[in-house]
């Protein structure tokens, strides 16, 4: 390092983080590349630079400016054309599986009228705080921050709002302090109403995952949801077949109460990727009700969610 470079005043460990250091008329300004640093590390670097430069006779004032590249956050919508197909369970478990694979993942419960993520992620008693008029997501014990109307409304309170109010609520949940989150999973309500339109218009997703059971009625509605994303030029990442086969815990026999293979066949017909199957399993239902999603464990169902999450990571 040149002796005329003010960065020579700093030890190499600090100088490596300083992109620019100027000293003029007694005022020192250090521009620090803070990408990837936590708040404590940033504070330590600022203190060290201030202390070192403060000992110089030619420096009467020091200002340290932290800069970092803005996180390129992808919004992935999880949707279906109808309720009761396990969309919220899939969204929560995919968020956890993606987090375990190394992503920084946040989860928005966009089902304004029937929020379920606080129960699934065991955050029912948490209340989000606000900073600068924006909500701060609730931290779950699975490493996935989450925001839901269930965190804001009283337990059991019915949300009787017209469409514009629901759309405004969604905006507050998405436009929150998500920090360095690189993937934001949005658990959409069933159907193709105001909440979906608000999201597509204001927070256009990078892609969408469609969830359906194998039965024909659910598939018809899933295809309808797919058309909505097509009209908004949002690519459909693929389809997931949920409740795909029930394994009897006593005899091990597999039955198909909702049919079998319908979603994969629909994906082929629509020329869309088939992302995988999630079985109709008591453990998955019990885990969701108990706030202990199976994707957080190491069982066979965790592997099913991890396999789908891996395909999302590669997309």
Regions found by a protein language model. Give the residues of each.
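Switch II (G3) loop of P-loop NTPases
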Residues: 149-165, 169-198
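Walker A/P-loop phosphate-binding motif and the immediately C-terminal alpha-helix
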Residues: 74-109, 226
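Short, non-transmembrane amphipathic alpha-helical segments
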Residues: 9-17, 24-27, 33-61
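Inter-motif core of Ras-like GTPase G domains
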Residues: 176-178, 196-217
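Residue-level signature of catalytic and energy-coupling elements of molecular machines
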Residues: 18, 53, 72, 83, ...
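Short glycine/serine/threonine-rich phosphate/pyrophosphate-binding segments
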Residues: 84-93, 115-116, 188-196, 218-221
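C-terminal lobe/tail of nucleotide-utilizing enzymes
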Residues: 2-7, 15, 34-37, 43-47, ...
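Phosphate-binding loop that captures ATP/GTP phosphates
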Residues: 98-160, 167, 174
């Amino acid at each position: 390092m040149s002796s005329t470079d003010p960065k020579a005043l700093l030890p190499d460990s600090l100088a490596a983080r300083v992109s620019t250091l100027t000293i003029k008329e007694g005022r020192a300004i250090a521009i620090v590349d803070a990408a990837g640093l936590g708040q404590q590390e940033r504070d330590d670097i600022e203190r060290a630079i201030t202390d070192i430069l403060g000992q110089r006779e030619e420096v009467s004032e020091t200002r340290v400016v932290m800069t970092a590249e803005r996180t390129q956050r992808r919004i992935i919508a999880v949707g279906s054309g109808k309720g009761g197909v396990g969309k919220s369970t899939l969204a929560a478990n995919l968020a956890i599986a993606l987090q375990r694979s190394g992503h920084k993942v946040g989860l928005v419960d966009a089902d304004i009228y029937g929020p379920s993520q606080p129960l699934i992620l065991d955050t029912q008693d948490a209340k989000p705080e606000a900073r600068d008029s924006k909500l701060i997501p609730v931290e779950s014990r699975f490493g996935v921050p989450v925001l839901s109307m269930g965190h804001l409304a009283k337990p059991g309170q019915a949300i009787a709002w017209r469409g514009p109010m629901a759309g405004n609520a969604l905006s507050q949940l998405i436009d929150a302090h998500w920090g360095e989150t690189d993937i934001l999973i949005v658990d959409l309500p069933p159907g193709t109403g105001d909440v979906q339109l608000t999201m597509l218009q204001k927070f256009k997703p990078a892609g969408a995952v469609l969830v359906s059971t194998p039965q024909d009625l659910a598939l018809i509605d899933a295809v309808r949801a797919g058309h909505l994303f097509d009209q908004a030029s949002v690519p459909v990442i693929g389809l997931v077949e949920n409740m795909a086969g029930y394994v009897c815990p006593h005899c091990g026999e597999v039955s198909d109460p909702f049919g079998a293979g319908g979603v994969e066949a629909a994906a082929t017909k629509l020329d869309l990727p088939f992302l995988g199957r999630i079985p109709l399993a008591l453990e998955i239902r019990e885990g969701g009700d108990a706030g202990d999603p199976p994707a957080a464990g190491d069982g066979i169902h965790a592997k099913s969610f991890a396999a789908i999450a891996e395909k999302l990571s590669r997309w």
